[in-house]
Amino acid sequence: MTANVDGVPEKFATLGLTYDDVLLLPGASEVLPNAVDISSRISRNVRVNIPLLSAAMDKVTESRMAIAMARQGGVGVLHRNLSIEDQVNQVDLVKRSESGMVTDPITVHPDATLAEADALCAKFRISGVPVTDPAGKLLGIVTNRDMAFESDRSRQVREVMTPMPLVTGKVGISGVDAMELLRRHKIEKLPLVDDAGVLKGLITVKDFVKAEQYPNAAKDAEGRLLVGAAVGASPEALERAQALAGAGVDFLIVDTSHGHNSNALSWMGKIKSSVGVDVIGGNVATRDGAQALIDAGVDGVKVGVGPGSICTTRVVAGIGVPQVTAIYEAALAARAAGVPVIGDGGLQYSGDIGKALAAGADTVMLGSLLAGCEESPGELLFINGKQFKSYRGMGSLGAMQSRGQGRSYSKDRYFQADVASDDKLVPEGIEGQVPYRGPLANVLHQLVGGLRQTMGYVGAASIDEMETKGRFVRITSAGLKESHPHDIQMTVEAPNYSRK
């Protein structure tokens, strides 16, 4: 650690600062908030258009949240409190939600029943599927309209499908030509076939509509939405990582409470060498911890030990580093290696995002700020006439308790995988609820808008400039009190402020 206080014994000499301890200094600026570049890296090879990730928590990020995050320019990290099969399915749902071209379209056999075809459409939230033979040759297409008025769900698909010849395109068709075919023939789906008539891809009107509706969406090289996923540090994690990579996940986060641990570091190296996607390591809170992750070969460093609103690590274990100092320290190691830093936890207001970036983070991960969104998987609750959504830490008793066939996918994050009985678990988190906040797009609009304002005040035209130009002033408790609205009874809540 670097920040020592004169006259204090070395063992106690490190000063730790968090978001409420500092403010950013306003600087000379020619930067307009609406003109700043807020794109950034989350790992060596993955970029996002806004520097925000949704946390890998079971009350924050599943496929619906991940889709919404990517459409707004960020990215969601799917939690791992799921079976491998279920987590892979979540990745598949995100990747199939929209794309420039579906390279591996869902298909159905002509002998399948309408009930089976309908279930397939419902599972993947699609309105129809191509019909192919075992060799992959396109035979026709069946859509919701074909099935809508069929009361006998045991009928075969071949009896109601629209058979060949269909309007099709060749592999490699341009987006302009594909759109022209869709428009001219008034169809919603354009199958792509090779010279032998074998189905090779699918383009839909929906993808063009979504591209216009969400121009800032974060996408991969194939035009699919970006998505990440969390894995653990164990033999099961290696199998999980390989399955997720095979499903098309863009990056993995090795998700542990203490990344500066030899076992965790060993598994990070094994996972990195076995998959062809970027691997982010975490969590750490010191320069040495970040360096250990980098030495293990990770492509990104996730910082935060105990800052989250639902985390009790700092009081149960007495461990942690205030988040601004933790980010600054980790960035000292990461910058030299060209590895991005993710600030994970402790953010309460949009202004905290700018503070994290100025301290050295490239992006930030959000939990409680997004847990109240419509797209989060938490249960919607009504309490005294007000709406809330359930939220809990992944170290809470509820998250770590056995699931399904006596299996927990969360407790190994806190190195308690071998605890056989739930009543012997030592939780490092709590369960509760947060106010319902409506659609994610509205919440992100306020968070991103606040960040743009921060950058305008600092005079930073990009995320990189936030770190180089951002300067802090440490404040007292009186300074913090002055920073919030005071000496007034607030009668109307602003969409981006409430007193915590």
Language model segments and positions:
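Alpha/beta catalytic cores of nucleotide-metabolism and tRNA/nucleoside-modifying enzymes
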Residues: M1-A28, V108-H109, G169-K170, A230, ...
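Active-site-adjacent beta->alpha loops and helix N-cap segments on the catalytic face
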Residues: N34, I84-D92, E150-S154, S174, ...
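Bateman/CBS regulatory modules and CBS-like beta-alpha motifs in cytosolic regions of diverse proteins
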Residues: N34-V48, A55-M57, D86-I126, V131-D133, ...
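Short beta-strand/loop segments at the ligand-binding rim of alpha/beta enzyme cores
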Residues: R47-S54, G100-P105, M164, D220-A230, ...
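Catalytic cores of alpha/beta
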Residues: R64-I67, E239-L244, A285-V303, G343, ...
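Catalytic beta/alpha-barrel core
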Residues: L78-N81, T107-V108, G128-P130, T168-K170, ...
